[in-house]
Amino acid sequence: MEYKQTLNMNKSGFPMRGGLPMREPDMLKHWQELDLYNELLKKNEGKPLFALHDGPPFSNGALHMGHALNKCLKDFMVRSAAMRGYYTPYIPGWDNHGMPIESAIIKQNKLNHKAMPIPEFRSACHDFAQHYIDVQMEGFKRLGVVADWEHPYKTMAPSFEAEEVKVFGAMYKKGYIYKGLKPVYWCYHDETALAEAEIEYQDDPCTTVYVKFPLHDDQGKLTDEEKKNLSFVIWTTTIWTLPGNLAIALNPVESYVIVRNHQNGEQYLVAEALMEKVMKVGGVEDYTVVSRHEGAFFENMLADHPFLPKTSRLVLADYVTMDSGTGCVHTAPGFGADDYQTCRRYGMDMVVPVNDQGRHTDYAGKYAGMLVEESNPVILKDMQEAGSLFASEQIVHSYPHCWRCKKPIIFRATPQWFCSVDSFKDDACAACDDVRWLPAWGIDRMKAMIRERADWCISRQRRWGLPIPVFYCKDCGKPICTDETIAKISKLFGEFGSNIWFEKEADELVPEGFTCPYCGGKHFEKETDTLDGWFDSGSTHFASMQKDQGFWPATVYLEGLDQYRGGFQSSLLTAVGALGKGAPFKECVTHGWTVDGEGKAMHKSLGNGVDPADVFKKYGADICRLWAGSADYHVDVRCSDAIFKQLSQNYLKFRNTAKYCLDNLTDFDPNHLTAPADMEALDRWAITKLNELLVRCEAAYKDYEFLTVSHAVNDFCVVTLSSLYLDIIKDRLYCDGKDSASRRSAQSALWMILDAMTKVFAPILAFTCDEIWLQMPHRAEDDPRNVVLNQMTKPYADYALSEAEMTAWETAFRLRSDVNGVLETARADKRIGKSLEAHVALFAKDEDTKAALEAVKAIDLPEIFIVSNVSTDEAAPAEGAVVEAGVSYPGLTVAVSEAKGTKCPRCWMHSETPDEHGLCPRCAAVCKALNVVFE
């Protein structure tokens, strides 16, 4: 007799292998036809708002793994919030203006951009940016990101530019924006100012020099002995800045010494705290201290410049430290922020002896026309020959480089537009207190950056950017930015785009009949600089979020760590400065960088990059999503083919668990779940464990701890289900009567588990969970179209076991672990084959073990151990039994012998009361109900 056909061995249409690269595009098509994003909004309309504001990626290249990580995390946020009952508008955006696009256009098309009409060049930049918006959008869609792809915001869009102009106008009106000559980061390769967020530091070798500035005028303060052959010794790592030296700064309260070099009769002024180090570097071994004075004593003395016909003034500054150098600080106001402020305090004129191209001007004398890096060895040689060089060293130091061209930059004073952050620093820091920061240290980092930052340089000497909406009166020369001009420019930009600024003359752009508010003049010219791209991204909360989406502030911003000095900060500053409000976000979350499998930065030159498109083709987008969802994203996230292979194995465990459930639910109607009172205790144990999973995952989603969700689901599948519960209930599912209460109890638990597990993992494993959802039987209240259109399952409180009952079950499973160990020994000794061939006898040697056996008396131990018989009251182990002590319970003795009775040909359980066909009572009853005909 073939009994297989009498078993409940059903098969669903859910394949064991995912085939994700082939299957996912069809699912994307289904989502598109469903209009999933808008359906999600309709589902939760009128419910509490969860607004994730998309910090815009830059539209200058294809998708990379950093993009993938960022967008996966955002999609997890949106999907999980929607499934927790929130209304979740999500408008994707792109940052379009800036030097990287200009550079790419020039290189790609070999353009002479300086000879091109500006509107024509800007149009080429626009097309380039739009191309990569399209490329990136397709990549994000392939990743499964649910968003309003039909209506993204773009910082180059006329509507956006019109609103950004208003942000500038509001800050100008409050007096926060001004034009001044101040040192800024300057890339002379690209001929533009840079923001702090556009700077990358690299270790560069350099020659550091100690230079003698001979005394010129001591203001009658020094004795003849002190001033004889006296020089002030300065130290610098930037030789090329020496032509710009105007002063030497000393700390007013530190002790300075005049040191006599007995080897050559020279005398040097250095800080006493640094004297030994300086003398050692200079090779001066025989020296004495002539005198000591506080730094303030030397104020306003004059020194001769070492190679130019001019003098340098001795000034005082609190920032002069005794950590390095000589205590006498080379001060060139055109090349340093502190230098600039100090010289300004002393009423000195600004000197900037380097032009936009990084070449020395005529002010530098014989070095005029040289690039700064070319002049270093020449100046060094000249100082050596003139006897001005006290010492030199070769060191490696961290030096700023341009984020785009990767070349060293300089600090250089140029006329720029600035935002006076000092005016509202306190308000910006106070706004941070109302934000939830994840990680928690984010608030300290942000506040420190705001407090320490200089005024924000918001102008760029570039063409592809939003024009700074300022006019200049040709008669009085004053800059003009009024409510009237801002309103007119905003209207023009909104209608025609910002190219109109370069297509029309100033007189055509100002309001009709407009006159200079200072002198009444009627003729104007336009500002030629454009706005910093960070001003663009810092305006998105107003230009997109508030205007187009109708809410403010956002629930959350999520971006990379670099955005503390980038988008997070610029958004905070514009919100406080322009709008007079608090932070534009209630929560601020950061993620780390994506790095290779060894933790190294990914670069094309190193060949260690991972292309998301390759991941999609080889593994599928869900594996990429699982990578993002399994990572501690607050630190750097490793990425490699080996990692994706391992994740694919983890994925298969989840998929196989789902397949097991689906295969055993093909004949189940979840509208008729087994009631709690009627459900088998083992099934209620599984539901209680499910409840624990749901509580843990709900808390994790609230804190955006997706790693916790992924690990919890994986552990639940592997530990609770696959290796325990699912293994135990196979007999009930396959062999009990199809409609029996015991089987329906197991099916009810299976459905509850699969339903909840699919929903709780759906924000992360979007494609696979939806595939499962489409295969599942559903209740009447479910939305069968897509899993994300349903709410997360709440814990099944009515089905939960008590704490005492759960303790008893945990005891049973600890006993099971000990029994399994002995079963393995018996199997290895060939005493038994399958575990169903075993009879297990348990013996307690101590009170704790006796109590454990007493606690599990109500539990069906043969079912739990998957054996035919279990006894706890035998006097001694059977003859020939395999006997071992327990591990979980050292006081336990486990004896395994051959099962008593006859092996049932249908379920393979051994029975001492078989029928005439050898069937156990359970299988005999099932076959009778099925009207099985025995031949």
Language-model region placement:
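Acidic, turn-prone loop/beta-hairpin segments
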Residues: 95, 184, 188, 194-200, ...
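Cys/His-coordinated zinc-binding microdomains
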Residues: 191, 461, 477, 520, ...
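Protease-associated
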Residues: 247, 254-328, 337, 341
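Alpha-helical recognition segments enriched in aromatics with Gly/Pro capping
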Residues: 215, 346-358, 462-464, 486-636
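Secondary-structure capping and boundary motifs in well-ordered enzyme cores
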Residues: 44, 48-55, 66-69, 73, ...
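Short cysteine-rich clusters marking metal-coordination/redox-active sites
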Residues: 187, 402, 473, 516-519, ...
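Residue patterns forming the tRNA-binding/recognition surfaces of aminoacyl-tRNA synthetases
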Residues: 2-20, 26, 30-34, 106-243, ...
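N-terminal catalytic cores of NTP/NDP-binding nucleotidyl/phosphoryl-transfer enzymes
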Residues: 42-103, 234-241, 315-342, 346, ...
